[in-house]
Amino acid sequence: MDVLEMLRASASGSYNTIFSDAWCQYVSKQITATVYMYCALVMMSLLFIAWFLYFKRMARLRLRDELARSISTATNSSGDLRGLRFRKRDKMLFYGRRMLRKVKNVSGQMYSSGKGYKRRAVMRFARRILQLRRDNMPLEMRTVEPPAEYLEETIEGSDRVPPDALYMLQSIRIFGHFEKPVFLRLCKHTQLLELMAGDYLFKITDPDDSVYIVQSGMINVYISNADGSTLSLKTVRKGESVTSLLSFIDVLSGNPSYYKTVTAKAIEKSVVIRLPMQAFEEVFQDNPDVMIRVIQVIMIRLQRVLFTALRNYLGLNAELVQNHMRYKSVSTMSGPINSQTSQSSRQAPNGPPMVINQLNLMQSAASGTGSGVSVTVTRPPSSPSRHSREEHTLSDPNPNPDGSFHGTTNLFTEVHGDAPNADLFQQQQQPSVGNLSTRRSSITLMTPDGSHSCVQTPGVTTSIDMRLVQSSAVDSLRKELGLSEEDSHIIEPFVELRELEPNVTLITEGNADDVCVWFVMTGTLAVYQSNQDATRAKQDKSDMLIHFVHPGEIVGGLAMLTGEASAYTIRSRSYARIAFIRRAAIYQIMRQRPRIVLDLGNGVVRRLSPLVRQCDYALDWIFLESGRAVYRQDESSDSTYIVLSGRMRSVITHPGGKKEIVGEYGKGDLVGIVEMITETSRTTTVMAVRDSELAKLPEGLFNAIKLRYPIVVTKLISFLSHRFLGSMQTRSGSGAPGAPVEANPVTHKYSTVALVPITDEVPLTPFTYELYHSLCAIGPVLRLTSDVVRKQLGSNIFEAANEYRLTSWLAQQEDRNIITLYQCDSSLSAWTQRCMRQADVILIVGLGDRSHLVGKFEREIDRLAMRTQKELVLLYPEATNAKPANTLSWLNARPWVTKHHHVLCVKRIFTRKSQYRINDLYSRVLLSEPNMHSDFSRLARWLTGNSIGLVLGGGGARGAAHIGMLKAIQEAGIPVDMVGGVSIGALMGALWCSDRNITTVTQKAREWSKKMTKWFLQLLDLTYPITSMFSGREFNKTIHDTFGDVSIEDLWIPYFTLTTDITASCHRIHTNGSLWRYVRSSMSLSGYMPPLCDPKDGHLLLDGGYVNNLPGHLWRYCRASMSIAGVFPPFCDYRDGHLLLDGCYTNNVPADVMHNLGAAHIIAIDVGSQDDTDLTNYGDDLSGWWLLYKKWNPFTSPVKVPDLPDIQSRLAYVSCVRQLEEVKNSDYCEYIRPPIDKYKTLAFGSFDEIRDVGYVFGKNYFENMAKAGRLGRFNQWFNKEPPKRVNHASLNEYTFIDLAQIVCRLPETYAVNTAELFSEDEDCDGYISEPTTLNTDRRRIQVSRAGNSLSFSETEMDSDVELDLKLERKMDKSTQSSPPTSSRTDMRGKEEAKHMANWHWGVKHKDETGSGATVATHTQTGQEQELQQQQKLQQLQQDQGARAEQLVDKDKEEDKENRSSPNNETKN
């Protein structure tokens, strides 16, 4: 609110709302009389009270004298009683009755209307006069400091492991995946090296064949440049290693290398553990699965650590790969070469090789003599220029626009069934051999020295024998895979040939389905990567060229070994012929020859540049458990860290010992980069919130790359600039007193979310499905339960031996999805503990209308994940129209909760159905579009960092425009996730958060505005104007009547209000406490209302608009936000006693505060007044008489000079104006100002008119935004495509591939429990309160559920029958259309498919004793066992089918009896 505007209105006599100008003059003249009158009244009141107390005392004295006289008379009549005394028991009885009698009298006086009534009346009158009334203090939120473990690292060592073994486990990631016997065998080969200062650990020309781990001391690793200078890469300290895992592959593949540029020297006396790489040979011979797993881990490290650090953060792409490799021969044949060579030339860079005349080629092959040559065979283009700019797929006549393939089955067209020697040109969409007869033919020869010889024979008919080409491709791929000639029969059935036209896409980046190993026979392939440079993203969005693949080279080995998606996009650069082997075929070959993984890995390593090898020595792959510190405060900063997975927390320790959260880092963030560049000590301590993986980039390596590749400096400047701009936008307002924990620069975008139920009554599965449904609109999301993981990875996946498989699989799922939901079990199982370790945030789900007590299971969750952020989610049924209440009790009982959410649930969430029914129900729900205005969508946007905030500014009666803008926002389809307000905006925002119904909000706002126009109420509220004109009592009553005793915590939508704390001289943000009080404080305009005294600390709070004009019981903070200085008194906070005034003095549009609280997109509505900036330049001095003359002389030109109140008002709003300009210039806020300047601050009688102005303006504004395409970030930020139906029980489309498990057929012992396959909850179906979950002796089972509902609800019986009929039809169609199972299908997959089929039919197999499902243990070791298992499963299925038929008949008979029994009873 504006003091200047009110004074001007008073001077002009144009108020017409509260008081007139004549009345103001009367008050100014009679001020002395008013003082005397009030003093006389107070003196009379004091005299009356003194007389009353004196009269009571005199009456008590007279009564005492009468009692004394009566006692003395009785004593004289009875004689001398000095020798008598009372017994102790009598004394106790006497005094006890006396005290009880007094207590009874006092308690009776509290409610009686007789004795003491006059005294109570006088005291009430005195309290009213002297304002001695004491408010009933509401329930306060307990401010509990987080536990010490939340901000402290874990400092615990492992005393049971020897130091050398512990350093080996910690330093090199691959050792962590060895089993204990294998690791102990490796330890036998270790050697201890003692080095003095200056001794070389290794130097140039030494063999690179060992792993070095520093046990004590320090080692310096540096590189030698060509000019003789050296540059340090890193300093290796205690527990760290010096090794290159790429050299590890060279040694194992039989191609050991030497140190060419890297040297290691001891800085001080050191002890180093040396482990020869040859020691692994002995282990790998006996354990081929260990070899495959080690190679896979090395390749994953190469892709996730080296490529991630060098590409995404240093801007290096093509520098990582050698682009000029020596051409290899495709095939070597003996025979003379036709000497009719017209010319010999090099192949053109962009032109395809010509076609060879096979007549001469066959003659030379038949002769069997001649020198070795290389023959390249391909087809020339008919018009190269016509095809050079468009992409084609190989099998689809209508290819995708991007040239990508449609899937694995359509990726390549089969040549001719399974025949490997079929004619290549007899495929669809390809020209026949006859088309080649009229074309120009040529021969391209490649000599052993790499030169090309091209012979052109125009007009000669070609006759190509594809069997020769097939044989050449098989021989070349056999050599690339390191197989002998005797192994040709293994690879021959899987080799396929294809001809490519220019710009045909073989695989796209991020595709995991079309991974193959491609061998180029003729032509050239180009390898691309997406442009990751943020600075050039808007200018150049095309893919970046990495390198070319020439004839004789192989590509695709990295994605094949890692089992992950392809990191590159591969296209044909010219007409080319390739030979390839699919992923499934490669894995089948690996089963027979596991050592091909070494040759595939060696092929990948040969392609890498020397820079990658040097970086491999310096970069480290670190795995941290929860609570472990990355670095500590005040340590030297010699490296930076990249978060690959997990979550980190930065904590600063102040000089007094107090610790504070500085920030949190998630996947992809760079930690410690600023300190490393500035060469300053660590300012904070960074620790792992959960199990995390990091890549360590030393300072020496960073400097070496920076000198060699200056583009790194540009990338670094861009990165630091974005971080600096982000910190500048979030700096203001974050450090103010009263700011919550969320105000810290902590990111609110989570990758993993764990869902924990408080009790068994919580419908956790429907809740997870609803949240999953809302998250699917934002991006790819995955829902995981214990049963889903078991079905995918085996029932024994949670055992310690399978730790690597589980963690790798979960990490891969997290990389693929923007968010992963971990649904915990209802007990503290192994899966629940795993969820706690993987979660970035834990959602504790409870029922809002139930008891708030903390259970034992919930306390265990807090103990397991002390450092993980926890948020409370309270569910409310929509049918009961219940509103949140008693939220403070929930939060006070759980001090570890940092945030809470109220979620209104539809009826289907609380349905009492079995797990199968719930899965089937949500399989249909997931096909629909989610409601973006629901509470689940609001929660989904919060978890993914896409929340939409609404900020309402202050402006007095002009705030009625907020109601119209709210209606326009609702009609525009914009969801509101967070609301903040100042002054009148605090009132309107609180109304919306409380009801979320525009009709109800409008009615309440209109009623409050009408109360503000009643003059007689304002006259009764007048007081002596020392602090303010009004006492604020009636104003408080209007706000309290509007909200009642509601707390901010009980609002549906997260809400905050902003006030000006005149006690601490800053603004305060209120996110909890009394609503009406803080709204009143935010409306306390200086001079009209006294500041509100904060009950927390006693600080005086004014209108928050003085510092920020755009931003418990609820009404108190609303009242505090409306404490206009001078009009209403400051409101005293009931928590600390601070005085609160209107928030408009500090920040009238607190959009920056909303941004700090986590809102990504903000709509800010400003209705405040605007100051006149067109003032008169009056020179160096100013005379008041001159101004008076100008004012009263109508013949002179008017001047605009601010008067004293105007100057004071402008000074008060200096901070607010500066803050408003920052909000207008920000990129995260949409600033809107309706045209309401003609309305006065106190024109509350024009509510409907101002509201209509705001509605019309808002409607037109959002329509124009929609036409301009700017409305999408508010109401169309999610994916509008209809969701696709997915199978949530399995993850067949993309899963982690454990080569050791697949290739070596490891014995996997698992339990086939048919009871586990029927539901996702291993404990029970449905709720625990259902009779079926507790009755374990029931032998009868439901088959096809003919006419019966598992929920025992009579109203659902018909729908269940219809659903079963649909399921039966679907099963019949699927069984008829499904192809026969391949012979290479894994046994585990067959079992799951059969049991899942039985599950869909509703069959639960239990033994005759009723003890549950029979558990059979199987072991996969060979083809014989597979056949035996197949026969057993078929027999088991037949037995189940026969038993099912019997049970169906039996159930039908019982159903008929049950249905007929009620009719018989009614007849009887």
Swiss-Prot record:
A nucleoside 3',5'-cyclic phosphate 1 binds at residues 174-301. InterPro entries: Acyl_Trfase/lysoPLipase, cNMP-bd_dom, cNMP-bd_dom_sf, LysoPLipase_patatin_CS, NTE, NTE1_P-loop_dom, PNPLA_dom, RmlC-like_jellyroll. It is a single-pass type I membrane protein. The chain crosses the membrane at residues 35-55. Residues 1374-1383, 1419-1441 have a biased composition (Low complexity). The lineage of its organism: Eukaryota, Metazoa, Ecdysozoa, Arthropoda, Hexapoda. This is Neuropathy target esterase sws. Interacts with Pka-C3; interaction inhibits the catalytic function of Pka-C3 and the esterase activity of sws. It comes from the Eukaryota. Phospholipase B that deacylates intracellular phosphatidylcholine (PtdCho), generating glycerophosphocholine (GroPtdCho). This deacylation occurs at both sn-2 and sn-1 positions of PtdCho. Its specific chemical modification by certain organophosphorus (OP) compounds leads to distal axonopathy. Plays a role in the signaling mechanism between neurons and glia that regulates glia wrapping during development of the adult brain. Essential for membrane lipid homeostasis and cell survival in both neurons and glia of the adult brain. The active site is at S983 (nucleophile), D1103 (proton acceptor). Residues 950-1116 form the PNPLA domain. One of its GO terms (biological process) is protein localization to membrane.
